[in-house]
Amino acid sequence: MNFPLLPVMITDSITDLTPELLQEKGIRLLMLDFDNTIVPYTTSVPTEQMAAWLEWMLSSDVQLCVVSNSRNDRVKIFCKRLGLDCITHAKKPFSKGIRQCLDRYGLKPAECALVGDQIFTDTLGANCAGVRSILVTAIDNHNIWLKLRHVAEKPFIFMARKRRIYFEES
């Protein structure tokens, strides 16, 4: 069993993920963290690159669902505008929102992955739910708390890389 704070996969950006690569790994559903994974905390507008990636992924056989801890309506508005399914109030690292997503899609954890920028919420929640965890670099560290959290996560990223846990090898 892997240590629950180590991501199963690591990549720089969510846009590095392709439908072909995910399907090759047996992933039928990609759960997406919202803040700092798709857009910064300070906006609800995706970059052109992110909007194009989301459109490309939505046209593929890999299903997408935003699973966010946010209670803010901006997540629902964003998802509705782009045609994305979403679950808010997910309570990561607890598995409530992740399990709700699995139930909604009728899939087994092994058929799913969750991509996010935080080890202590996204990675831990995914691993504890049996879903593959994909860690991406945060889009923005706009305040001191985010910077401190990412500093606290560095040893786990180092351990994951030392164990050669990269996306290509998972």
Placement of each model-derived feature along the sequence:
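Asp-based, Mg2+/Mn2+-dependent phosphohydrolase catalytic module
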Residues: 2-32, 39, 43-44, 48-114, ...
